[in-house]
């Protein structure tokens, strides 16, 4: 075995290590770099190793190998694409689909990879074997194929409003049927006790069932039916089982939602609405939780007794104690409810952390906008002499900076010194009056034409 083959083998085993719980893209790119050094020989070597890894029983190895295959097809040229689209390799992939020992989750992962490769190879007729394999999977195992993502049609006027209303009606009817079946089951349990009350309830439901639908049909959350991984900046990526909080409808078949602090749009055919609990169900849940919390003292006492017995070595005496048996018998039935409560509060914690992240992002964006607005209103600085250096007017005269106003420090004089002083006399009493030549004779008297 050559040194290059040894390097490829070691790199591939590292990238498809069963201990990896997710794809390590650094390891995958290392394999791609080694293959690109000699696509002819190294390509055959890596495909031989990939085929052996796909025959392993470890699902983790197969998942990592599928990711490596996609990366090789996208980064290592036409020679690797020919090998991946060969009849031998496509038959190996279909064998995983047909195998009864392969879990359905792994089969869906294989189907997703086949679809991705089929879309990548569709422009090359020589690679149509991968497209034929995907068509075969759709015929033989349609349950493995995810629905196509709908196009983003803008909502305009009446036509889009009617489509939105039809979609809302469909969601409302699905929720109403679920609630109706639940009510029928509850009525069947109570029929043996109170038959007249059951008849009255049927009459009330038959009289006005449609009036109760809108109050129960507000879709606030949806659950993902499939995995969706996207590179679009405005789209939301999620995994099967994730609960997405609905924010608004952006397109006809796309809604906007929030998940783990991220916001984006998602296709409606990838999710299903979550039935919001009624007031009665919420009250029952609170009562069950209250029962669990009321047993806290008993649980602590049992825990302390068992710990003390394990330290002293008196386990046999503790097991024979009827009080310990009674406490154990009262605590054990609470385990399913405790498990549900742990999941519930873990989800609430995740929602609160997601909301905190959304608020932090919104606050950061708001502060950035406020800073930009404040900077836009700041007046530009006054240009200094350096700005005018080298500038000339149209007549080639240099442009000089504006001169500063000079302030003289002369002493203050109450009267101007350059006005001639006159000494007229008042015609009434011949007393001399002093004034300045301002256009009338005496400053102390009003000017001519002035009316008091």
UniProtKB/Swiss-Prot annotation:
Present with 358 molecules/cell in log phase SD medium. Residues 162-181 form the UIM domain. Component of the ESCRT-0 complex composed of HSE1 and VPS27. Interacts with the ESCRT-I subunit VPS23, the UBP7 deubiquitinase and the E3 ligase RSP5. May form a complex composed of VPS27, HSE1 and DOA1. Interacts (via SH3 domain) with DOA1. It is a peripheral membrane protein. This is Class E vacuolar protein-sorting machinery protein HSE1. One of its GO terms (cellular component) is endosome. Residues 197-207 have a biased composition (Low complexity). It comes from the Eukaryota. The modification N-acetylserine is found at residue 2. It comes from Saccharomyces cerevisiae (strain ATCC 204508 / S288c). Residues 144-166, 187-212, 389-452 are annotated as: Disordered. It is found in: Endosome membrane. Residues 217-276 form the SH3 domain. Component of the ESCRT-0 complex which is the sorting receptor for ubiquitinated cargo proteins at the multivesicular body (MVB) and recruits ESCRT-I to the MVB outer membrane. Residues 15-145 form the VHS domain. Its main location: membrane. InterPro entries: ENTH_VHS, SH3-like_dom_sf, SH3_domain, STAM, UIM_dom, VHS_dom. Keywords: Acetylation, Endosome, Membrane, Phosphoprotein, Protein transport, SH3 domain, Transport. Belongs to the STAM family. GO terms for biological process: ATP export; late endosome to vacuole transport; microautophagy; multivesicular body sorting pathway; positive regulation of protein maturation; protein secretion; protein targeting to vacuole; protein transport to vacuole involved in ubiquitin-dependent protein catabolic process via the multivesicular body sorting pathway. Pfam families: SH3_1, VHS. The modification Phosphoserine is found at residue 162. The keyword DNA-binding does not apply.
């Amino acid at each position: 075995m050559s040194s290059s083959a040894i390097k490829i083998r070691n790199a591939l085993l590292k990238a498809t290590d069963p201990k990896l719980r997710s794809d390590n893209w650094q390891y995958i790119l290392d394999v791609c770099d080694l293959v690109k050094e000699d696509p002819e020989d190294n390509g055959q070597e890596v495909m031989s190793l990939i085929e052996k890894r796909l025959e392993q029983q470890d699902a983790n190895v197969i998942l990592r190998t599928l990711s490596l295959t996609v990366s090789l097809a996208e980064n290592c040229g036409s020679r690797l694409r020919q090998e991946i689209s060969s009849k031998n390799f496509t038959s190996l992939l279909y064998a995983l689909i047909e195998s009864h020992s392969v879990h359905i989750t792994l089969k869906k992962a294989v189907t997703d990879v086949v679809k991705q490769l089929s879309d990548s190879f569709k422009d090359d007729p020589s690679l149509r074997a991968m497209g034929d394999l995907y068509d075969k999977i759709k015929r033989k195992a349609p349950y493995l194929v995810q629905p196509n993502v709908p196009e983003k049609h803008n909502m305009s006027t009446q036509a889009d409003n009617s489509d939105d209303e039809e979609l809302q009606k469909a969601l409302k009817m699905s929720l109403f049927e679920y609630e109706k079946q639940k009510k029928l089951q509850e009525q069947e349990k109570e029929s043996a006790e109170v038959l007249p009350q059951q008849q009255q309830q049927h009459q009330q439901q038959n009289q006005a069932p449609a009036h109760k639908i809108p109050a129960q049909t507000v879709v606030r959350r949806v659950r993902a039916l499939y995995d969706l991984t996207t590179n679009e900046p405005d789209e939301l990526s999620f995994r099967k089982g994730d609960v997405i909080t609905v924010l608004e409808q952006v397109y006809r078949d796309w809604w906007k939602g929030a998940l783990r602090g991220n916001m984006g749009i998602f296709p409606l055919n990838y999710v299903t609405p979550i039935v919001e609990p009624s007031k009665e169900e919420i009250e029952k849940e609170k009562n069950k939780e209250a029962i669990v919390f009321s047993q806290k003292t008993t649980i602590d006492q049992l825990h302390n007794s068992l710990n003390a017995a394990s330290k002293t070595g008196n386990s046999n005496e503790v097991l024979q104690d009827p009080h310990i048996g009674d406490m154990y018998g009262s605590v054990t039935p609470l385990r399913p409810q405790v498990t549900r409560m742990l999941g519930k509060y873990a989800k609430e914690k995740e929602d609160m952390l997601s909301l905190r992240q959304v608020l932090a992002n919104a606050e950061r964006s708001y502060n950035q906008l406020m800073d930009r607005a404040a900077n836009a209103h700041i007046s530009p600085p006054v240009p200094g002499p350096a700005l005018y250096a080298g500038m000339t007017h149209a007549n080639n005269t240099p442009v000089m900076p504006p001169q500063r106003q000079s302030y003289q420090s002369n002493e203050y004089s109450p009267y101007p010194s350059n006005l001639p002083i006159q000494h007229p006399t008042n015609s009434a009493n011949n007393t001399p009056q002093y004034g300045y030549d301002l256009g009338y004779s005496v400053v102390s008297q009003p000017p001519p034409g002035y009316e008091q």
